[in-house]
Amino acid sequence: MAITWKQFERYWYLFSLAVIIASLPFSKLGLSIGQMMMAGGWIVERFDWRRLIASLHERLTLRSVLNSVPLSFFLLFNGIVTGFKQFAKNRPALIFSSIFLFHILGLFFTTDFDYAFKDLRTKFPILLLPLLLSTSEAIDRKSFYRYMFLFVLAVLVRSGYNTWMISIHHFVDIREVSHNVSHIIFSLLLTLSIYSLLFFIFNRGLLLLWQKGLMLLILTWFIIYIITSQSFTGLSVTLITMLVLIPVLIFKTRNRLMKTILILGILVIITGLFLSLRSFVRNYYHVNPVDFTKLDQKTSRGNPYIHNVASTQTENGNYLWIYIQWDEMRGAWQKRSRISFDSLNKKNETVAFTIVRYLTSKGWRKDADAIERLKPEEVDAIEKGIANYIFRDEFSIRGRIYEFLWGFDNYRETGNPTGSTLMQRFEFWKASVGIISENWITGVGTGDMNLAFKAQYEKMHTKLSPDQRWRSHNQFLSIFIGFGLFGFLWFLFSLCYPPFVLHRFDDYFFLVFLIISVSSMLAGDTIETQTGVSFFAIFYSLFLFTRKEKDPIFHQDI
């Protein structure tokens, strides 16, 4: 069956949108191609072909063909202007895309224009995607669901690929499996997929029973993947989204039984989290008693131990700096590993210190006998920089909490946050506040953020390793640093005004997306990478500007 040109343009737009959504878990190139396809279709759709053809039909000569060239450029320019006029009438989309405008205005306060223009290229989807989606014909609910199924399928395929890669490769950091798409962004995609599946499973009449069973299997797999891939970000954002969403559901539902179940559910979750956390912290700070007056002075091989009884550092309740025999450990380690005892492990941390921590975590003495007792997989773990046997577990909440507490105690004693992800973030935030205090009105501009952080770290005399002196790892602080107080307030307004005026705060998909996005922005620079900004811009625009109908959190009969 033949299709009209208008239908082809529509199909091209829908296909381009599918390419963008399907590329999110896989490819930056796919994202770029999808956006270029959509932009090209958007321009062609507004090009006045009839006027161009009419000018050629009047008199088809070489001169008329040559004259059609400037006419084509005029029609191309006119079509783009027409599209922007449409865009200007859509105030919510225009205000959201104004986030990009602030990055342009930030050029007035910039000295590093190379980085500034790179940042503008990265952030361009914040302008492009709202422009293209808000000025195109909206999609109906059925088509929207198909796009969400496509998204879930893409995340499912990528999670399967990642699992296969994990099984055949030995990653120093398992998060490297998502190297072409940040593991943090992929965890956000996972979380959005999980809550999309929950919507389809619990929405009555939407799917057949066997289809819901299939969705439940995929949901179960995503949860298993989060655990096996050690995606602490994915688990945290999923949990935070639940803790925010449940009170909203409690407020929205008029069903007393449902309200009671939800209240009991959130109380159980919060109580369980509190008790678990308290137990982990107590266990971490529990110290196995030692009589320092009765410490053995020599190893089984007759070499003297070193005992630093003044140090209170522990690992799993065992004192770190007693029963140390460096020469024995060095000699025994060289027989077990190709990495030198006095060099750095694969995390660029001292091998000797990692060995001491690992052996202490098991309650062993630090001598040749202990090194010889290590299993080959434990030697491999130490080479990778794993300093506690608990951290070898595929996923360990206790290990993550111990890692944080260790970093906190070490930071408190030495002032050096290097090696602890959370303590490093505190140092990033401390530097961010310092920069803001000196540039709170205008900010440092679009391109000077790296220079500002470099100067601030020097000013603070930070003990952070030079290769770990990163930016704020908080999107709100990054905006404040770049554009000052007014830019920060406008950023918040740009996020909140569109859903407010469009009455979408009670839309399930947008609310879930907003919670996920804000959660990620509190602990990361979500829109500072191509995949991050594309995730943010495409779903914000899809949920607000592209759908004809919204999906309320609760139907009227619930």
Q: How does the language model describe each region?
A:
Residues L29-L31, K118-T122, V177-S193, Q230-T233, ...:
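Membrane-interface micro-motifs in multi-pass membrane enzymes
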